[in-house]
Swiss-Prot record:
Protein name: Oligodendrocyte-myelin glycoprotein
Residue span(s) of the pro-peptide: 418-440
PTM per Swiss-Prot/TrEMBL: O-glycosylated in its Ser/Thr-rich repeat domain.
Lipidation (GPI-anchor amidated serine): S417
SUPFAM superfamilies associated with the record: L domain-like
GO BP: cell adhesion; central nervous system myelination; neuron projection regeneration; regulation of collateral sprouting of intact axon in response to injury
Source taxonomy: Eukaryota, Metazoa, Chordata, Craniata, Vertebrata
One of the record's GO molecular function terms: protein homodimerization activity
Membrane topology: Lipid-anchor; GPI-anchor
InterPro entries attached to this UniProt entry: Leu-rich_rpt, Leu-rich_rpt_typical-subtyp, LRR-bact_E3_ubiq_ligases, LRR_dom_sf, LRRNT
Chief localisation class: membrane
Gene: Omg
Keywords (A to Z) from UniProt: Cell adhesion, Cell membrane, Glycoprotein, GPI-anchor, Leucine-rich repeat, Lipoprotein, Membrane, Repeat, Signal
Superkingdom of source: Eukaryota
Ranges where the LRRNT domain occurs: 25-55
Naturally occurring in which organism (per UniProt): Mus musculus (Mouse)
Length: 440
């Protein structure tokens, strides 16, 4: 009896001693840590899963092997958090992956298509690396990959940026592809994106509003693309966005055009004007008059008992220094009160002149004939100094020559009365006013 009890006790002891080893067995081709829940089977030339893997493993590294197909082979590992199947010969992502995955790397395989079924139930996945494959198409569905924060699709054969990318993405790497376009609305939901890598592609331009919602962006790479710097209509949006964004831009496209836009934003110029300035001195009669001088030089020729004629010269000199902005039109300085319809013609500008006359004839009243003969004919001539070339003739002058012809009196000569002198002065002023109005 005692012998049987002792025999049973030894068996129980051996069973209790071996039980932990049975529960925590590690495959011979792998190394295990963290209580055999982290399993590393990389670089063992495996083509199938090694036997003896525990179903409660949380980390599995199968990289650098010769796997070509892992469909439905990883489904039992419902606690799996990290899966590395990079550097194998897989042509597609394994079907029926456990939904517990957080991180998955499938880089450097032969995957040509990332189909919607490959990621349909990966609600917990945060990191997905499918770089260095042969991807030509990526199909994503809305409301899948809800937790995805990092998506690496670099070094593939993509020609358009994938649509329906998850809104929680922080990092998207699309570098080293053959990307040529971004479809409208592709990036509109990526409001949490902080890093976007687009270098080494074939972009020529970025469509309007493509980057407008990337408000959290911290870094973007744009170098080594085929930007159409000479097509301003297409490239203007990207250049303005580069100037205004707070993100760090690596590889600024069309640097010369960006510098030009920065200068224009710092020194804005009204439409139709250029930024150059030049000075024009005393070139135009139509301006505010700084100095107005009038010179009266009476010249009287007498014959016995008659007045043959009288000649009076009025000289008007205008001067003005003005600075103008260069435009595409001819340079003409117009006063503030010049009518709008006159500002488009050199002739209108030259004809507009205002002369203020003083009473210079009152002292010559004694020269007026007192005869009852008809009013003397008056001849007025105006010589305008409008230059044909402003740069060659900067000073402008206007000369008014007034000549009055009087008939010969046969009667006795006597000093003219004051009434006759006033009549002559009034007629002269009226005629002068009429001439100035006609000239204007």
């Amino acid at each position: 009896m005692e012998y049987q009890i002792l025999k049973m006790s030894s068996c129980l002891f051996i069973l209790l001693f071996l039980t932990p080893g049975i529960l925590c067995i590690c495959p011979l081709q792998c190394t295990c840590t963290e209580r055999h829940r982290h399993v590393d089977c990389s670089g063992r030339n495996l083509t199938t899963l090694p036997p003896g893997l525990q179903e409660n493993i949380i980390h599995l590294n199968l990289s650098y092997n010769h796997f070509t197909d892992l469909h439905n082979q990883l489904t039992p590992y419902t606690n799996l958090r990290t899966l590395d199947i990079s550097n194998n010969r897989l042509e597609s992502l394994p079907a029926q992956l456990p939904r517990s995955l957080w991180n998955m790397s499938a880089a450097n395989n032969n995957i040509k298509l990332l189909d919607k079924s490959d990621t349909a139930y990966q609600w917990n996945l945060k990191y997905l690396d499918v770089s260095k494959n042969m991807l030509e198409k990526v199909v994503l569905i809305k409301n899948t990959l809800r937790s995805l924060e990092v998506l690496n699709l670099s070094s593939n054969k993509l020609w358009t940026v994938p649509t329906n990318m998850p809104s929680k993405l922080h990092i998207v790497d699309l570098s080293n592809n053959s990307l040529t376009q971004i479809l409208p609305g592709t990036l509109i939901n990526l409001t949490n994106l902080t890093h976007l890598y687009l270098h080494n592609n074939k972009f020529t331009f970025i469509p309007e509003q493509s980057f407008d919602q990337l408000l959290q962006l911290q870094e973007i790479t744009l170098h080594n693309n085929r930007w159409s710097c000479d097509h301003k209509q297409n490239i203007t949006y990207l250049l303005k966005w580069v100037m205004e964004t707070k993100a760090h831009v690596i590889g600024t496209p069309c640097s010369k055009q960006v510098s030009s836009l920065k200068e224009q934003s710092m020194y804005p110029t009204p439409p139709g004007f250029t930024s150059s300035l030049f000075t024009m001195s005393e070139m135009q009669t139509v301006d505010t008059i700084n100095s107005l001088s009038m010179v009266t030089q009476p010249k009287v020729t007498k014959t016995p008992k008659q007045y043959r004629g009288k000649e009076t010269t009025f000289g008007v000199t205008l001067s003005k220094d003005t600075t103008f902005s260069s435009t595409d039109r001819a340079v003409v300085a117009y006063p503030e009160d010049t009518p709008t319809e006159m500002t488009n013609s050199h002739e209108a500008a030259a004809a507009t002149l205002t002369i203020h006359l003083q009473d210079g004839m009152s002292s010559n009243a004694s020269l007026t004939s007192a005869t009852k003969s008809p009013p003397s004919p008056v001849t007025l001539s105006i010589a305008r100094g409008m230059p044909n070339n402003f740069s060659e003739m900067p000073r402008q002058s206007t000369t008014l020559n007034l000549r009055r012809e009087e008939t010969t009196a046969n009667g006795n000569t006597r000093p003219p009365s004051a009434a006759s002198a006033w009549k002559v002065n009034a007629s002269l002023l009226l005629m002068l006013n009429a001439v100035v109005m006609l000239a204007g």
